[in-house]
Amino acid sequence: MRKLYVVKTTREFNDIINSGVCRKNSYFVVHLKKNHLKYDRFGISVSKKLGNAVFRNFYKRKIRSMIDNYKKDFNNQTDYIIILRKAGLSKSHEELEKELFSLLKK
């Protein structure tokens, strides 16, 4: 995922979380908000409660690869914040991918 398509600052994260729409399932929480740009942006969060930095970065890379596989299907001019839940840790890559995109396409 290119840097252009990433939500990075705490201010942007908080703005999307506080004033955007929230969608949930047992594996993910997705906050989304329309942006004024011509492309979608994604932010990924994995809580410190779920494991050490190596573990959290592994799951962030996993989610990033899921997004890269389907990025061309999205062009909604929307910012997304994807938060992994503890229940998602025990699921396979395919199950997580299916659940994530069911939330994003609602």
Predicted regions and their residues:
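Positively charged, solvent-exposed patches that mediate nucleic-acid binding
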Residues: 1-106
